[in-house]
Structure formats: C-alpha cells, structure tokens
From Swiss-Prot:
Residues 230-250 are annotated as: Linker. This is Bifunctional protein GlmU. In the N-terminal section; belongs to the N-acetylglucosamine-1-phosphate uridyltransferase family. In the C-terminal section; belongs to the transferase hexapeptide repeat family. Residues 251-457 are annotated as: N-acetyltransferase. GO terms for molecular function: glucosamine-1-phosphate N-acetyltransferase activity; magnesium ion binding; UDP-N-acetylglucosamine diphosphorylase activity. Keywords: Acyltransferase, Cell shape, Cell wall biogenesis/degradation, Cytoplasm, Magnesium, Metal-binding, Multifunctional enzyme, Nucleotidyltransferase, Peptidoglycan synthesis, Repeat, Transferase. The keyword Nucleotidyltransferase applies. Binds 1 Mg(2+) ion per subunit. It comes from Clostridium botulinum (strain Kyoto / Type A2).
Length: 457
C-alpha cells in the first residue's frame, strides 16, 4: 500500500507577533514543522509534500535537508484550498495520503502509524484524528453513527443542545484515499461567512458520497496547535516532559526534571546525573556516567564518559572521558579536549586542541592553539593569538610547564619537556629541555620612599 503525507505550513501566524513564519519557531530546539516532518518519516512515510506560503523562502531554508517536495499557497483561503494547492503532488498517485499541520509539533510517530493502519485495515475513505476534552467550547464536534463511524463534524456555533454535550473534538489531521480526496476537492466550495475552503467540508462531501469515515482518538496534547507565544510555551512544557521522561527511563538521573532543559535530538548515556538549571542543546551527545552540575550549558558537543561539568558553557566542542570542566569555564567552538584533563575556573578555550592529562586550572585564555599531553598552565596564562589582522597559531608540546602570568605571543612554538618562568612574555621558540625566562630583571632601589617623602613613620 502506497502512503504519503501533506503538511500544511502556509499560515501567517499573526498571533505570534513575529517576523518569522510560525512553523519555524522552535520547540525544544527543533522547528515545529520539522518535528512533524521527522515523525512522519519515523512512521515510514517517504513522500512528503509541504504546502508553504508566507515566508516560503525561510521555511524552505529550515527544511532544505528533509528531502521534501513543495507546493505554494499564494493566498491563504483555508485548509481545503491549501490541499487543492498540493493536487499536483497527488496527481497519478494511488493509495493513502495523510494531512497534518505544521504548527502541531506534538503529534507522535506512533500515532501517525496508528492512523495509517486504522485507515487502511478498516478500508475507510477518510479517517480523522480526534480527542476528548473536558471543555470542548470552540471546537468542532465529532458526531458518530451508532456503528462508531463518523457521521459528521459540527462546528461549535452550529451545534444543537445534544451536540454541545459531545466532548470529542476534531484535530484538523486526516487520512484519505487519494482518489476519494481528489474527487471531493472538485466539489469543495467557499460558500461560508469567511469565503474560505474548509477541509472539514471534504469529510461531509465524502460521507454524502456513501463512503466510510472513521476516527481514532488520541490524547489532547498530541493535537495541540500553536498559534501564540503562550501556546508555544505550553507545547515546550509537554515536549520537555516527554524528553526528560525518555532519558530517565533509559537510566539518566534528574535531580529536578522540571528545571532541566534538553533538546529533542540530545543523546545521554546511562548513569549520568543532571542537576537543576542545565541546558543541553542541539545535536549533543553525553556519554555514560557524567555529572552535570547546576547552570551548565552544552550545545552541539560530544562529552565523553565520566566527565564532570560544573557551572560552565561548552559549545560545538569535544571533551574526552574523565575530564573535569569548571566551575565557570567557557569552551568555545572547535575545541577538542583530551582524556583526564582539567579545565578549571574562569578558563576560556577557543578553537584549540588540549592533550590528555593536561591541566589548565584557572584564569587562562587559550585560543588557536595545539597543546600536548601532561602540560600544566599556571594561573593567568594568556595565548595572545590575534595580531590585529588575523589569528595566529601557538603549538605547545608534551610535558610543558607554563608559569603563572605568562603571555605566549602567537605564532610561537613551545617544544616538549620545557619550563617557562612565571611572568614571562614568550615571543620565540622554546627548545626542548630548556627553561625560558622572558621578564625584566628585578631592581631594588634602597631608600627610595624616604627620598620621595612617601615613607610613613
């Protein structure tokens, strides 16, 4: 059986009060529309068409790696009109098409699979996703036959007294036999107060043709649409609970899961402990037995097993197993830190490689450098990598000891097994096995304060 999907993503999203199209706003680190696309893919649906309109260039940019086809809805004339705009995608296809909305990011791949299975096994012409709620005010009601089939969808304003008591509501997500859908679209009109073409009318047209219409009921959170910043926040809360629950089931400890913020594509190994206030973003991988103390942020990075991170920021970097980072360290993009290293408080590292067992304990800046293994950086070391025009490189070999308050003026090389005296400014290569001293000779002027009249009696 051939299955495909259409995702409606052309809405203006006026209530978002944003210059960006609504569907590219993110929930737990991923654009809403990409949540829907990815879950459709996980349900083994290969052919996906995205109906775009306002901000189409931006939507395409955010979905360019999803292997989609696109249909353009130049004017927003309703959900039915959006599907009409995708008729070319359905041309000459036979099978089943599901229709989803790009602003409902909480739909799961399990529900999508269930929708197709229910629709195809029951040989329905159309199937919709519904939900039951305590207060259905404002929603279209699903009215069923005695057999359980869907009889009709009645908008709230059109409900009679009995229909108002129904708490099963329409989600705006459907499955259709492609041939039935295309035939029904031919009879769709905009004879309503808004002058728009509604997809709900296709259900009525299908039913009047004598075809079977079914519905599956799912939890309300799966059909939640996002039309405002408030609803975006509500969707974020639901998604975050799902993400954190998944990691806890897989063996991750959360000291307070309600104040821990993890993006949807993050991977975390078992026996890792995460303290409150941590933010883990993007395509980050954290391996087993790590400890992330409060208020740490990690983005698009790989953290090896047994790493401890305390009150620190790690961006687009790799940290080797057994390393400790922080408190208050800043690891900037393109940094690779080896195994069992120590990156201490108020250390900033940018675009550098740090070898195994190297210690950078405090108050140090390292930029555009290659640092070997078993090195020690004294407090206040600065790699001076910018010459006013471009960044220069520093190379430090294995077993180098860098004394406190040392400036390494790039480009410069410090070879293996070297010592640099505290307070030095190094501008030339330091040979292997040597001690480098580059500071002014101390001069003591006896009686100077007395001569200047500054000596306190």
């Amino acid at each position: 059986m051939y299955n495909c999907a259409i995702i409606l993503a052309a809405g203006k999203g006026k209530r978002m009060k944003s210059s960006m199209p609504k569907v590219v706003h993110k929930v737990c680190g991923k654009e809403m529309v990409n949540h829907v696309i990815d879950n459709v893919r996980k349900a083994n649906i290969k052919d996906v068409n995205l109906v775009i309109g306002k901000g189409s260039k931006t939507v395409k940019e955010h979905t360019k790696d999803r292997n989609l086809t696109y249909s353009m809805q130049e004017e927003q004339l309703g959900t039915g009109h959006a599907v009409i705009c995708a008729e070319e995608f359905l041309k000459d296809k036979k099978g089943t098409v599901a229709i989803f909305t790009g602003d409902a990011p909480l739909i799961t791949n399990e529900t999508i699979q269930q929708l197709f299975e229910f629709h195809n096994s029951g040989k329905y012409a159309a199937t919709l996703i519904s939900s039951t709620v305590q207060d259905p005010t404002g929603y279209g009601r699903i009215i069923r036959e005695a057999s359980g089939e869907v009889k009709k969808i009645v908008e709230h304003k059109d409900c009679n007294e009995e229909e108002l008591k129904v708490n099963e509501i329409n989600s705006g997500m459907y499955c259709f036999d492609i041939e039935v859908l295309l035939n029904s679209l031919k009879n769709l009109n905009n004879d309503n107060s808004q002058g728009e073409y509604y997809l709900t009318d296709v259900i009525e047209i299908t039913k009047k043709s004598g075809d079977k219409v079914g519905a599956i009921v799912v939890p309300y959170e799966e059909i939640m649409g996002v039309n405002s910043r408030v609803q975006l926040s509500e969707a974020e809360i639901v998604m975050r609970k799902r993400i954190n629950h998944k990691h806890m089931v897989n063996g991750v400890t959360f000291i307070d899961c309600e104040s821990t913020y993890i993006d949807v594509d993050v991977e975390i190994g078992n026996d890792t402990i995460i303290y409150p206030g941590c933010v883990i973003q993007g395509n980050t991988t954290i391996k087993e037995e790590c400890t992330l103390y409060s208020n740490s942020r990690i983005c698009n990075s790989v953290i090896g097993s047994g790493v401890i991170v305390e009150n620190s920021v790690i961006l687009e970097s790799h940290v080797g197993e057994g390393t400790t980072v922080g408190p208050f360290a800043y690891i900037r993009p393109e940094t690779k830190i080896g195994k069992s290293a120590r990156i201490g408080d108020f250390v900033e590292i940018k675009k550098s490689t740090i070898g195994d067992n190297t210690k950078v304990s405090h108050l140090t800046y390292i930029g555009d450098a290659e640092v070997g293994s078993k090195c020690n950086f004294g407090c206040g070391t600065v790699v001076v990598n910018y010459d006013g025009q471009k960044k220069q490189k520093t190379i430090i070999g294995n077993n180098a000891f860098i004394g406190c308050n040392t400036n390494l003026i790039s480009p410069v090389k410090v070879n293996n097994n070297t010592y640099i005296a505290a307070g030095s400014t190094i501008t030339k290569e330091v040979p292997e096995g040597s001690l480098a001293i580059a500071r002014s000779k101390q001069i003591n002027k006896e009686g100077w304060l007395d001569k200047k009249g500054l000596l306190k009696k």
